[in-house]
Amino acid sequence: MLLSVIVVSWNTRELLRACLASLRQELVALTGSEELKDVEVFVVDNASADQSAEMVADAHPWVKLTANADNRGFAAGNNQALAHATGQFVLLLNPDTEIVPGALKTLLNFFDSHPKAGVVAPQLLNTDGSIQRSCRAFPTFLGMVFELIGLSRMFPAGSSYGQKFREYKMLDWNHDDERQVDQPEGACLMIKRQLLDEIGTLDEGFFMLFEEVDWCFRAKKAGWEIWFTPTAQVLHHYGQSIKQVKVRMILSSHKGLYRFWHKHYRGNRWWLDGIAYSGLMALAYVRIAAYRLRGLISSS
């Protein structure tokens, strides 16, 4: 099997419908057959209430569907499919994406010319065609504090001052050239099978957010290269798969950052546990309050 594609969905039925339509068109072009020989597609639905699973079963019988009885999270959902995936390469794909023609072939061919690459990510585009800044540096505790309190926004990209505050989101790079990176956004990642066999699957202790950061960190620690290439493009309806749970998303993000710090940076500094966790959760509730004041989330 050449390629296994995995999509984890939760209440994104119409986005998922468009995602699978674009994916099938791309896979037919890639394989030269409507039978989709040598590729497989998994959809893991995390107990959606919008009939996402029923839509997949009815409209896309070529997909291997798993309909969970409860929301097991992004990492666990991907791992469910990874346990059955047999491809030499695995594509992790968000349901709020649409493949731009030629992207999958470009990503697959990339590994031929970059033998040390374990992961390659495409350029993500907004619906208006503009480029999303989708790559990040690995988070440090101090760097994330700068980000969460808004210092990165106080010093605009390209300015000669405040560069340290912009490092996490790589704001001084336009995402228009090919380069090695720390962590591309998990909306679309092409992964080599040998990497999965070596470092394992996603850490299910991360329910939603930071699981791919942890996974990329482990990959680079094991000596693999992670690449971004603008020669492959994917349309990304940014944030649509998580915007419905803004409060939960913020809390999960801060808990994920704490788990990442504890797992990779804490060492024997046990005395920092309470400080780090309390500080991050306090910042989370400050962000939630700010969103409510701006009317971006409800008070419920």
Residue ranges and their predicted role:
Residues 67-85, 106:
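Glycine-rich, basic loop-to-helix element that forms the pyrophosphate-binding segment
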Residues 98-134:
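Conserved donor NDP-sugar-binding/catalytic core segment of glycosyltransferases
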Residues 90:
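Short aromatic/hydrophobic "clamp" motif used to bind/position activated sugar donors
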Residues 1-37:
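N-proximal low-complexity "stem/linker" segments adjacent to membrane-targeting elements
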Residues 173-233:
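A short, conserved alpha-helix in the catalytic core of glycosyltransferases
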